[in-house]
C-alpha cells in the first residue's frame, strides 16, 4: 500500500503583486472568444479554445502584428510595475 501523500503548502500570492503580462495569443483570444461562441452556439470551453488556436495559427505575421504590439506594451507595463513592487516590498521589510 502506498504511503499517503503529504500536502504541500503553496505560498499565498500577494494581492498587491502586479498581474503577469498577457501573450499576443491571449490578447487575440480575449478579443475573439465571444465571436467564436456566437458563430458556434453550444460548444464546450475546450472546443472554443481549439478553434481559437486554429485561427491563431492561420494568421500571418501582419495579422498577428497588432497583438504582438499589445503584448510587448503589456510586458513593459509588467516589468515596470514589478520593479516598483519589489522596491516598495524591500522598503517595507
UniProtKB/Swiss-Prot annotation:
<dbReference type="GO" id="GO:0005634">
    <property type="term" value="C:nucleus"/>
</dbReference>
<feature type="DNA-binding region" description="HMG box">
    <location>
        <begin position="18"/>
        <end position="86"/>
    </location>
</feature>
<dbReference type="InterPro" id="IPR050342">
    <property type="entry name" value="HMGB"/>
</dbReference>
<keyword id="KW-0158">Chromosome</keyword>
<dbReference type="GO" id="GO:0005694">
    <property type="term" value="C:chromosome"/>
</dbReference>
<dbReference type="InterPro" id="IPR036910">
    <property type="entry name" value="HMG_box_dom_sf"/>
</dbReference>
<dbReference type="InterPro" id="IPR009071">
    <property type="entry name" value="HMG_box_dom"/>
</dbReference>
<comment type="subunit">
    <text>Weakly associates with the stable SPT16-POB3 heterodimer to form the FACT complex.</text>
</comment>
<protein>
    <recommendedName>
        <fullName>Non-histone chromosomal protein 6</fullName>
    </recommendedName>
</protein>
<comment type="similarity">
    <text>Belongs to the NHP6 family.</text>
</comment>
<keyword id="KW-0238">DNA-binding</keyword>
<dbReference type="GO" id="GO:0003677">
    <property type="term" value="F:DNA binding"/>
</dbReference>
<dbReference type="GO" id="GO:0006281">
    <property type="term" value="P:DNA repair"/>
</dbReference>
<keyword id="KW-0539">Nucleus</keyword>
<keyword id="KW-0227">DNA damage</keyword>
<keyword id="KW-0805">Transcription regulation</keyword>
<keyword id="KW-0234">DNA repair</keyword>
<comment type="function">
    <text>DNA-binding protein that induces severe bending of DNA. Required for DNA-binding by the FACT complex, a general chromatin factor that acts to reorganize nucleosomes. The FACT complex is involved in multiple processes that require DNA as a template such as mRNA elongation, DNA replication and DNA repair. Also augments the fidelity of transcription by RNA polymerase III independently of any role in the FACT complex.</text>
</comment>
<dbReference type="Pfam" id="PF00505">
    <property type="entry name" value="HMG_box"/>
</dbReference>
<keyword id="KW-0804">Transcription</keyword>
